């Protein structure tokens, strides 16, 4: 990904490498769009994952390795600009494929636009811009912003209890207020007609207290602001047997969704 901002050892832009990055990105998405063009609305394309960030201009031109000894040197502002250009190119590639045989569905397909690092605060930064749908009649209705939510870090990511930032429980008024204040920032997208997909959220590990309350609040408050949250499975669901591993979690799902007889281990 850092090929988009490649520079030589003296800080001069390596335009040959940068052009190659665009060429590769366009080739990848052209193939994907045409290969799956006849699939229906259950298939959503996403422009990237967490890589649209400082990765597009940092020292690592892949994820962890340099590209032929070259390193990137984009500023943070420039990384935002490149991210916005990549997302716009993504929309154009998919929409332009709709005139190919069996690809008509790509004209109206829902597209997921990767936020900056898929980080909530960085995506709500004014430098991040949603792309323009090149099918004018779609307006904003076929574009959704993609973010991941693991905040606060001590709760969402950390598993080591010896870490000073580890948060082993969730449910205080402060916890609720923080989640609400964060999610309220996302309304800038839903208020302007865009969808919001919280493509990942989680809680470190299942030893923590208050997990059902946390997941419930993400789901219910997320719905209020027009977001669809997708839980990262931190061992609450047994994929082999298709059952929920914790009774209180299953009860919470029944309460929130109205489902009955949620399969329990």
Features from the language model and the residues they span:
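Flexible, glycine- and charge-enriched loops at secondary-structure boundaries
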Residues: 15-22, 76, 80, 169-179, ...
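Active-site region of glycoside hydrolase catalytic domains
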Residues: 19-161, 167, 184-203, 224-225
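Generic hydrophobic, helix-prone segments enriched in Leu/Val/Ile
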Residues: 14, 18-25, 117, 128, ...
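Aromatic-lined carbohydrate-binding surfaces of glycoside hydrolases
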Residues: 1-11
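Substrate-binding cleft of secreted/luminal carbohydrate-active enzymes
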Residues: 173-264
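Generic structural signal for helix capping and beta-alpha/helix-loop junctions
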Residues: 5, 120-121, 206, 239
């Amino acid at each position: 990904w850092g090929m988009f901002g490649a520079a030589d050892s003296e800080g001069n832009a390596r335009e040959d490498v940068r052009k190659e990055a665009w060429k590769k990105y366009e080739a990848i998405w052209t193939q994907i769009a045409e290969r799956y063009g006849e699939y229906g609305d259950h298939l959503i394309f996403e422009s990237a994952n967490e890589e649209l960030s400082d990765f597009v201009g940092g020292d690592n031109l892949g994820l962890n390795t340099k590209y032929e000894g070259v390193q990137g040197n984009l500023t943070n502002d420039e990384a935002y600009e490149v991210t916005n250009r990549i997302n716009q190119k993504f929309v154009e590639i998919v929409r332009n494929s709709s005139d190919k045989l069996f690809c008509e569905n790509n004209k109206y397909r829902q597209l997921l636009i990767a936020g900056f690092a898929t980080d909530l605060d960085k995506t709500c930064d004014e430098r991040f811009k949603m792309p323009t749908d090149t099918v004018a009649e779609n307006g904003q209705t076929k574009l959704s912003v993609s973010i991941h939510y693991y905040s606060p870090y001590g709760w969402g990511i950390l598993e080591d209890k010896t870490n000073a930032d580890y948060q082993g429980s969730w449910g205080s008024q402060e916890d609720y207020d923080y989640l609400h204040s964060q999610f309220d920032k996302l309304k800038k997208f839903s208020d302007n007609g865009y969808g919001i997909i919280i493509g990942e959220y989680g809680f470190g590990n299942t030893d923590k207290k208050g997990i059902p309350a946390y997941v419930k609040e993400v789901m219910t408050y997320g719905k209020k602001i027009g977001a669809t949250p997708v839980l990262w499975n931190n061992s609450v669901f047994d994929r082999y047997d298709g059952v929920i591993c914790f009774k209180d979690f299953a009860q919470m799902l029944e309460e929130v969704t109205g489902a009955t007889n949620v399969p329990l281990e």
